[in-house]
């Protein structure tokens, strides 16, 4: 069963591409026709590609790995922040910091700096600074929160990158490709899909179109997270059951020893009887 359908995408305007003169020929396989100088995306292919991408993202989430979402364009920022925060995945909706992937250790240091400032505030160290120093530190903390707050829990490189606008987020895509991180993306008719591993042909400018695609993607990731949770619970129950059986096995050992001893005693008694009978015959 598809995660979304043709009509839902149609109502969201996901089929509207860019002007014909702005098109990228490499998107030709995903274009249905041209109408009034605008390319129309083949939504049947969008449904297929969206399902393919969603299933792959589900498996990534199920394995316990993270997907980093990138959408800094105005139409997508609020939608991405709301929907992705709800499923607990990291996201970037402000400026993409150069080296966020290729220079990840430095980014982690900046995130840790933010945590250090919080710790100073909580333990009272912050009170020892002058008013001017407090103001500078507060501004620094606010800037870090704005740019890196949404990836604070990303302790290692993500397993995949999801991009809403390939052209606008070209730097993020380049960094991901350098590190062999698979890229999932909404790709409009004016974009080059060459570096995208999972192409989702769709209008990346309309808010409704972006929301529909993200709903399907977030739904798949949520499924993966839920299945992982259930598997862990099942594993924990099996471990508890196994631990519960362990004492029973220990208790069984004395009974086995007693049974063996009784068997040996019986054999010895039988031998004694045979010996006694033999001695009587000899007499």
Language-model regions, residue ranges each:
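Intrinsically disordered, compositionally biased charged tails
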Residues: 1-3, 226-283
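Ribosome large-subunit tunnel/peptidyl-transferase-proximal elements
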Residues: 1-233
